[in-house]
């Protein structure tokens, strides 16, 4: 019962869309109405408000970290509990019950989850994102590369035997890549927006 309640709680935590909440609180347009229409930090940055983008990034990462940390802190379900909380909070961000299941792509939330699973895992994945983003200026490309490497880092650090968290990390990576399928098409066509590119007037 504890595992079930923790999993549901993690999903509800993940369902808090900071892109929408922060934008509304700061009097900005709903991020689902412009740019990529994705309620995430990168799209909020297209509004031109860096503070809102940073708050969105921190909030989305924090909720991922919090959901997993709470399960670890109170020892709910061991590794299985951690794995379920990780998947649940991630799915909450992708399909938030509070926002008609119209969620983001999960990059920041996944980063928070990985930091809670193990700081080295989270930092290694975040560093991968930063390196790719710095050199290529595409948030989506950085996310895709980081998603590919996250399970590899996890296996390298912890192995695969009796490790449900490794499967959770792999599942998040697959889901994140799937959520970026339109970005993959745009990258291949040379039409993807770069980091910091503002929304077009009238969009």
UniProtKB/Swiss-Prot annotation:
It comes from Burkholderia mallei (strain ATCC 23344). The lineage of its organism: Bacteria, Pseudomonadati, Pseudomonadota, Betaproteobacteria, Burkholderiales. Keywords: Cell inner membrane, Cell membrane, Lipid biosynthesis, Lipid metabolism, Membrane, Phospholipid biosynthesis, Phospholipid metabolism, Transferase, Transmembrane, Transmembrane helix. Pathway: Lipid metabolism; phospholipid metabolism. Catalyzes the transfer of an acyl group from acyl-phosphate (acyl-PO(4)) to glycerol-3-phosphate (G3P) to form lysophosphatidic acid (LPA). This enzyme utilizes acyl-phosphate as fatty acyl donor, but not acyl-CoA or acyl-ACP. GO terms for cellular component: plasma membrane. PANTHER family: GLYCEROL-3-PHOSPHATE ACYLTRANSFERASE-RELATED, INNER MEMBRANE PROTEIN YGIH. Its EC number is 2.3.1.275. This is Glycerol-3-phosphate acyltransferase. The gene is plsY. The keyword Transmembrane applies. The chain crosses the membrane at residues 3-23, 51-71, 74-94, 116-136, 140-160, 164-178. InterPro entries: G3P_acylTferase_PlsY. Probably interacts with PlsX. It is a multi-pass membrane protein. GO terms for biological process: phospholipid biosynthetic process. Belongs to the PlsY family. Its main location: membrane. It catalyses: an acyl phosphate + sn-glycerol 3-phosphate = a 1-acyl-sn-glycero-3-phosphate + phosphate. NCBIfam families: glycerol-3-phosphate 1-O-acyltransferase PlsY. GO terms for molecular function: acyl-phosphate glycerol-3-phosphate acyltransferase activity. It is found in: Cell inner membrane.
């Amino acid at each position: 019962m504890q595992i079930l309640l923790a999993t549901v709680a993690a999903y509800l935590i993940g369902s808090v869309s900071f892109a929408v909440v922060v934008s509304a609180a700061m009097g900005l347009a709903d991020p689902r109405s412009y740019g990529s229409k994705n309620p995430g930090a990168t799209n909020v940055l297209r509004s031109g408000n860096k503070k809102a983008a940073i708050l969105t990034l921190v909030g989305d990462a924090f909720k991922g970290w919090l959901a997993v940390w709470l399960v670890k802190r109170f020892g709910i379900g061991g590794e299985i509990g951690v794995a379920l909380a990780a998947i649940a909070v991630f799915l909450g961000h992708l399909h938030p019950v509070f926002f008609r299941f119209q969620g983001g792509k999960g990059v920041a939330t996944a980063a928070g989850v990985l930091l809670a699973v193990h700081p080295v895992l989270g930092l290694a994945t975040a560093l991968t994102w930063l390196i790719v983003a710095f050199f290529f200026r595409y948030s989506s490309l950085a996310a895709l590369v980081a998603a590919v490497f996250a399970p590899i880092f996890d296996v390298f650090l912890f192995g695969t035997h009796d490790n449900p968290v490794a499967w959770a990390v792999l599942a998040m990576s697959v889901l994140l890549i799937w959520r970026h399928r339109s970005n993959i098409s745009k990258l291949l066509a040379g039409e993807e927006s770069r980091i910091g590119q503002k929304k077009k007037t009238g969009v």
